[in-house]
Amino acid sequence: MKYTSTRGGLIGVDFEGVLFSGFAPDGGLFMPEDIPKVDKRTLQTWSSYSYIQLVKEICSLFISPESIPRADLEGLIDRAFIRFRHRDIVPITRLKSGLNVMEMWHGVTHAFKDLAMSCVGELLDYFLKRKNKHVTILVATSGDTGSSAIESVRRRENMDIIVLLPHGRCTKIQELQMTTVIEDNVHVFSVDGTSDELDYPIKRLFADSDFVKKHNIMSTNSVNWARILVQIAHFFYGYMQCAPLTELTPVEIIVPTGGAGNITAGCIAQAMGLPIHLVAVVNRNDIVHRTVQYGDFSLGDTKATLASAMDIQEPYNMERILWLLAGSEKSHIKEMMKEFQEKKRVKLPEQLHKKIAGAMTSCVVTDENILGTIGRCWEENHYLLCPHSAVAVYYHYQQMDSNDKSPRCCLAPASAAKFQDVIIKANLTPDIPQEIKDLEKKKTRSHHLTKEDDWEKVLRQTIESISQRKVQ
């Protein structure tokens, strides 16, 4: 299996090369040159597999044994999930009104980012130890990615991590999960900007290929292919749990969508032959919805919502989806993305718009809808939803109320315990685990950056300081 940039400037890259990259040198994102197909017999075999077994099978399709021998791959995947609190990793909770909720938040930080990030940490460690190398990881977060990335690499001598979080735009718990990790290899910056704005200095820095190479810089944001790869597995698992497999019945999988990394994994699962229909459910930051419905891929102002981790107006993983669906027209992606970067808007070609509208539907959910859904789910089931999970469940309730009884799986990306203010706003009482309560008592450490600061310059200085320390 080899990888290519979505903009065509680089082909034939192996898995290790992609793992240790951020954006490709031409500004694109890495994707597999070929998507492996899974036939009906394989699906039936996999139907009895655990989530971890599915991760192993799917990763082995995209990682050649020359890169990582199968036994080594299985061992590192087993290690990745040791700290998860539920033996099923992503259990499906079945509730009234035909509601199936995939709980993706049983990892260390109580968010679905732990699923892929724990594997990425082990994959990085595997290659770095073999080559006695060090990397510096750059991550921008809208809320959950930062803490998950930190947990995946903390105390690892061969990795340092720099995290940019949007000051005042995360929940208090999300911020504490990052700022209370006081380790020599963890560097947290609280920045006066939106999560989209935090991506800009990182993208500019990755464009400086000499600097990136000199300091061994990479990203574990969902620009990193390995994040997308691991996430493919939970679409297969959700399908197996919610469909009567003997009929290969299509299942609708409802995906709360911000940066579009998760739904990119869903599109790849679909391309592999999994009979699913995807629903991209967004908050008022609706660029993905406008793209699906109207072919209008245009930037809007980032709006603060109750589903704060989805407050993203520039979902860079849409480039992967467009490339995947473009078929023989892949060469046009480079020009489309160049136009988007320059004008902050692009109209999709008619054929490409038809393909994306065929692959998924979309829905916009307001804060009022979120609160109403949290309340309804509690009233019917005594089950608390986080605001992002409520975005998915809102769509399910809309379909149920219109008598659509199709098998459906709602992805629940985070625990309600991380969003106490929203639960209280819904006139309910949050249920808070002890480890989250304990965050309030811990010391914190972070560096504040204002609008007046040169963010890219600060990043460069921090990276140079890390490299200098490693030489000493």
From Swiss-Prot:
Its EC number is 4.2.3.-. The keyword Lyase applies. Gene3D superfamilies: 3.40.50.1100, Threonine synthase, N-terminal domain. InterPro entries: Thr_synth_N (IPR029144), Thr_synth_N_sf (IPR037158), Thr_synthase-like (IPR004450), Threonine_Synthase (IPR051166), TrpB-like_PALP (IPR001926), TrpB-like_PALP_sf (IPR036052). Keywords: Lyase, Pyridoxal phosphate. It is an enzyme of class 4 (lyase). The modification N6-(pyridoxal phosphate)lysine is found at residue 113. One of its GO terms (molecular function) is pyridoxal phosphate binding. Disulfide bonds: none annotated. GO terms for biological process: 2-oxobutyrate biosynthetic process; serine family amino acid catabolic process. Its cofactor is pyridoxal 5'-phosphate. Coiled coil: none annotated. It comes from the Eukaryota. PANTHER family: THREONINE SYNTHASE FAMILY MEMBER, THREONINE SYNTHASE-LIKE 2. Belongs to the threonine synthase family. Acts as a catabolic phospho-lyase on both gamma- and beta-phosphorylated substrates. Degrades O-phospho-threonine (PThr) to alpha-ketobutyrate, ammonia and phosphate. This is Threonine synthase-like 2. It comes from Xenopus laevis (African clawed frog). The lineage of its organism: Eukaryota, Metazoa, Chordata, Craniata, Vertebrata.
